[in-house]
């Protein structure tokens, strides 16, 4: 048996007992050869000498493993080098020679150039002619301009090219005439067969695909050997900021002082945990940033990363879920394991609603993968050990769709509202965004903040950038007030359109906008007028802009009734002046109807129904929360609500008509001024309309 050449399976083990490889030995008595055993034992020693990170990368990176299998083989590397050299040589030998840019020219221009003796060589292939001029000639739009020939006025100089190589197509069945014509003018003629691919061209077309197929075959063969870890999707894709953290601090965030204070306390807890632990305080496990889009939730998280001296893991919630079942839960586990290993640390999850939606409890089938990811997130957040010093910060602009289990204390202990900034906050944000921009002394940031109610931090940053773009386009060295005004008009009203309107239509639009303005001017408590314009912008033919002097957080019934009258002022002016109404009031009617429905159904401001909430006019934000809304409201109550809405609109229309009849002269003057100047500011509005009534107290 000692000399037998039978094969036997042998399982080689490392020195630590872990099986390495199953090999075939030629001798039954001896087992595995000593040389093979030494080689495998050496490879196991190399594996143990690698760092944990290198071992993890080698085991979880299948593509890197495959490439090592290719380039680690002498024969595989040799074939790759031979293929590359062969492809390069074939391309270098058979590639067409180029002596300059080639241009398509007309056949008539080609004939004229031959007759002038300006064509040196020609290659004829079927109906296609490739040739070369004796000298560079000017070509524009397929026409060749001979030396000394002037360019027509209709030719754009930017389209003129100087070329030495050209291509043209000859008429059918004229090869014999063209050949004789070229020989007559002593042009060197070459003929190539048309149709069918030459051997060099075929090789150049096929070799890259053969090489690619071979490479993919080698990759697939190496991947199949380690199919257990072929897809390393289970690891979290969170980005870690430790040493190279974002250069954003709380000083770069303005307008959200309360949110900054909440997050600053979390940062201080992570930097100095001992002083909190001494008195038994527990670090909040989660902080949820809630607010509209563009208010700075992600910017606050970046500021936390810049302020905190601890590892900061940043990930988008959409990165958890993939097409494979269980990947999301695996990534959540991996993320929290990495964070716990480097505690104290912070995990930031952006757009939490991507995985934190309320779990499905209705008809049909829910999203099992997303729900598994959410369940794993709930377990990880609630399964922290005491004093692990790991904080989860999440951001969302859709808190109403989040699962209640995610919002309970013990998971997200704090909900920080990041709302729209007030006037003072907007001014501070503008000062931050204009730090690196040269602005003129006439720019009033306080006034600009007052003129932008409802703007978020992202809107204000865009406003400053748009103003800088306007100034750069005008060739200015600084950004002045006019640049900011144009940028603000562009954001609020849209881009100016070069729309040609007739005089009658301009007059109609002028009276429509003047009607809005006159009703707003003579309605006590209405917002001041900032601008009236009949210049078409966006989808509107004209616009009347009102801006409150101070931010408002509550509106009285009288203020809303005045707003209804202002919205219907344009339609009332059309009816009064032209005894006809147009389609220009469509958006006004839509806004007025929605406002009246909210007054009746949400705020209880109707005399017919009194203080009652019906849910009318409520904006149902997100589908999937409830398929059908259950209104336990009688039909008679809904009919009365519709009648109340109609009454509010009719009374507002009558009020607008009454104001316009009383101030018909001012209406005509303002409309004439708009026709003449197109855009009118607040100073000229006061000159035309006279003294404005003082706002009276509410009823």
UniProtKB/Swiss-Prot annotation:
Residues 1-73, 220-699 are cytoplasmic. The active site is at residue 513. Keywords: ATP-binding, Cell membrane, Hydrolase, Membrane, Metal-binding, Metalloprotease, Nucleotide-binding, Plasmid, Protease, Transmembrane, Transmembrane helix, Zinc. Residues 40-59 have a biased composition (Basic and acidic residues). It is an enzyme of class 3 (hydrolase). ATP binds at residues 291-298. Binds 1 zinc ion per subunit. It is found in: Cell membrane. The chain crosses the membrane at residues 74-94, 199-219. Its cofactor is Zn(2+). Residues 95-198 are extracellular. Homohexamer. This is ATP-dependent zinc metalloprotease FtsH 2. It comes from Thermomicrobium roseum (strain ATCC 27502 / DSM 5159 / P-2). The lineage of its organism: Bacteria, Pseudomonadati, Thermomicrobiota, Thermomicrobia, Thermomicrobiales.
